[in-house]
Design a protein with these regions (language model features):
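A conserved beta-strand element that flanks and buttresses the S-adenosyl-L-methionine
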Residues: 114
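A short, conserved alpha-helix within the catalytic core of class I
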Residues: 122-134
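Conserved class I S-adenosyl-L-methionine
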Residues: 1-43
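C-terminal alpha-helical "lid/dimerization" subdomain adjacent to the S-adenosyl-L-methionine
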Residues: 146-198
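Short catalytic micro-motifs in class I SAM-dependent methyltransferases
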Residues: 117-121
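Short glycine-dipeptide loop
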Residues: 138-145
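Core SAM-dependent methyltransferase catalytic element
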Residues: 190-214
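Class I SAM-dependent methyltransferase SAM/SAH-binding core
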Residues: 51, 57-101
Length: 214
């Protein structure tokens, strides 16, 4: 069991998570659109191996299962995982805190690694370090990482939105900052806005991105 101080928030939220994202008129107003865009950008084919970080209640995982993918998923919340197992019983799910020791379930390579409304829990240097680790250790050569999240085109847009006062424990993406941070790491990120405060990143080694991406 993780000792992450954020865990109680998600344990308490699990039972009402799906209802809350469907009725929200703010950040999660584009929730279904984000899910659809992550799936579209991933461009999967049946039989592909997909890893989801922060699987939550399984809303994204079940979409990849329905497309014939082999799905693995991790989350630090037992309550969230219990719901995800009901929705996507075919998926291989494990308890794991991204800030702690990574599960042996990740000791393999995947065609796609995806995350949705998860990585804003980490500051930008941690995000980029995590992306580098995933590419180096867990992504197949021609694979992609696709991330849907609270995100803005620029740091200025994020500042103008007032997002920096929403939650002091969260760190929201700005595409310009992210692309600059990836410079020199061998990664390149492409960003597609979905709403005024959400969007999807496709991340891959620069040589692969430049030769064509979803």
């Amino acid at each position: 069991m993780t000792d992450n101080p954020r865990l109680p928030i998600f344990e308490q939220w699990a039972g009402r998570y799906d209802r809350s994202v469907q009725t929200d008129t703010g950040i999660f107003a584009s929730y279904d659109e984000i899910l659809a865009e992550v799936v579209r950008a991933a461009g999967v084919k049946a039989g592909m191996r997909v890893l989801e970080l922060g699987v939550g209640t399984g809303n994204l995982a079940q979409r990849f299962v329905a497309l014939g993918c082999e799905v693995w998923g991790v989350d630090f919340s037992p309550a969230m995982l219990a719901i995800a197992r009901e929705k996507a019983p075919e998926a291989r799910l494990a308890s794991m805190d991204l800030t702690g020791e990574w599960s042996p379930i990740l000791d393999q390579h995947f065609d796609r690694i995806v995350a949705n409304f998860v990585l804003h829990e980490f500051d930008l240097p941690t995000k980029v370090a995590m992306l580098e680790r995933l590419v180096r250790q867990h992504l197949l050569t021609d694979g992609l990482i696709v991330v849907g999240d609270i995100a803005f085109p620029t740091a200025q847009a994020r500042g103008n939105s007032g997002a920096e006062s929403w939650d002091e424990d969260e760190s929201y993406w700005a595409a310009d900052e992210t692309m600059a941070a990836c410079t020199g790491t061998g990664l390149e990120a492409i960003f597609k806005p979905v709403s005024w405060c959400t969007g999807v990143f496709v991340v891959k080694p620069s040589s692969i991105i430049s030769s064509g991406s979803p």
